[in-house]
Design a protein with these regions (language model features):
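C-terminal regulatory/interaction regions
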Residues: 222-231, 235, 242, 248-264
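Histidine/acidic residue-rich metal-binding segments in metalloenzymes
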Residues: 1-73, 84-101, 118-121, 158
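Short, acidic/turn-prone active-site loops that include or flank metal/cofactor-
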Residues: 21, 78-82, 107-109
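C-terminal cap of metal-dependent C-N hydrolases
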Residues: 168-222, 230
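A structural signal for short secondary-structure junctions
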Residues: 47, 68, 95-96, 164-167, ...
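Short, charged, surface-exposed secondary-structure boundary motifs
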Residues: 84-88, 112-114, 184
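His/Asp/Glu-enriched, well-ordered alpha-helical/loop segment
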Residues: 37, 43-50, 92-180
């Protein structure tokens, strides 16, 4: 870890690291070092603005606040952690301590989709339910996590995350006339942001532009063969399933049995 830190400092890179991701990690840290992960990293000097701490699944509110105060950032993947662990990470404590939070979708096999609209909605709802408070994690806050604050958290705030002079032209065009996003009101109540966070699914995105290049127009992907990629992904998944079915180690996994039974 110290060597990684030296290289990152020398090259001006951030460190992307899963931190306090699960109870097994914490258990192993206590057995090996007598310290929980956040304290261990703090002792090594890794908790600073160069660390993107992913998940914080098992971090306490106090540990999350410590990481935030040190200047580290959080990559929050509400969907996958909710599905896999049934836990709401301490993003509220992290933000309350002044930390920057970025939203991530983790992995398709972990949350069943890579959809930032879904992550916005789940982040808002999970935290409202956890704290029994409808004012926790309002729509505008999670939208910022998905855009400008998320970009800042991963060290790209000067390049992307908002439409400003000098930044890269990354944008999407959303069909606000879609039934699930209607009506749109400007006053006395403005509902565009809540509609995007709570009602959008991503299918309302008509056009995608990255660095000024249009990658999708009117829902037609221009730079990739979408059909071929989907077909290949399906075939690769079948091959993985075949190998897992023949692997005696995987056959003993309770998680696999639960998935076969449709319990997840």
């Amino acid at each position: 870890l110290l060597q990684v830190k030296r290289i990152a400092c020398r090259e001006g890179w951030m460190i992307h690291m899963h931190v306090a991701q699960g109870d097994r990690e914490i258990e192993q840290m206590l057995k090996r070092y007598g310290r929980r992960t956040p304290d261990f990293l703090d002792d090594l000097g890794l908790l600073d603005g160069g660390l993107l701490a992913v998940h914080l699944t098992e971090a306490t509110d106090e540990e999350a606040a410590l990481i935030a105060r040190r200047g580290s950032r959080l990559a929050l993947c509400s969907g996958s952690i909710g599905i896999i662990d049934g836990i709401v990470p301490p993003a509220r404590a992290f933000r309350d301590a002044g930390g920057l939070v970025s939203l991530g979708s983790d992995q398709a096999s972990g949350n069943n989709c890579s959809n930032i609209f879904t992550e916005m909605k789940l982040t808002a709802l999970f935290n409202k339910i956890r704290f029994r408070d409808p004012e926790v994690m309002p729509a505008w806050e999670v939208l910022r996590m998905a855009t400008i604050e998320g970009a800042r958290a991963i060290g790209l705030g000067d390049e992307v995350g908002s439409l400003e002079r000098g930044k890269q032209a990354d944008l999407i065009l959303v069909d606000l006339g879609a039934p699930n996003l209607t009506p749109v009101l400007d006053g006395p109540v403005r509902n565009i942001v809540p509609n995007l966070v709570y009602a959008a699914s991503g299918h309302e995105v008509r056009t995608v532009m990255v660095a000024g290049q249009v990658l999708m127009r009117d829902r037609q992907v221009l730079t990739l063969n979408e059909g071929a990629i989907v077909a290949e992904a399906q075939e690769q998944a079948r091959e993985v399933a075949r190998r897992v079915a023949a692997d005696p180690v995987h056959r003993e996994m309770a998680l696999l049995s639960a998935m076969e039974a449709g319990q997840l």
